[in-house]
Amino acid sequence: MMKFPVYIHSISGNSVFNNGFAVSISPFSVSKTTEGSGGSNTGLVFESNALSQTSSANQAQNVTYAIQELLSKLLA
């Protein structure tokens, strides 16, 4: 399987980074400056739309199943 790494050097301010279809996430370091209300609310948040009843989730599930099927054929 080919790997296409994504390197993120910095995320600052009121930023959100969404990473879809990640097999593993290996940060070199994680830090946050706490300022203002809610500043102590830190941590990694993992969300999944696999159980959602919306059409976008159904499309995501179809892509996931297609990837799983492709991987099983490649590794067989």
From Swiss-Prot:
Q: Which InterPro entries match?
A: Spore_germination_GerPA (IPR019618)
One Pfam family this chain carries? gerPA
Please state which protein family the record places this protein in. Answer: Belongs to the GerPA/GerPF family.
Report what the protein is called.
Spore germination protein-like protein YdzR
| PANTHER family named in the record | SPORE GERMINATION PROTEIN-LIKE PROTEIN YDZR, SPORE GERMINATION PROTEIN-LIKE PROTEIN YDZR-RELATED
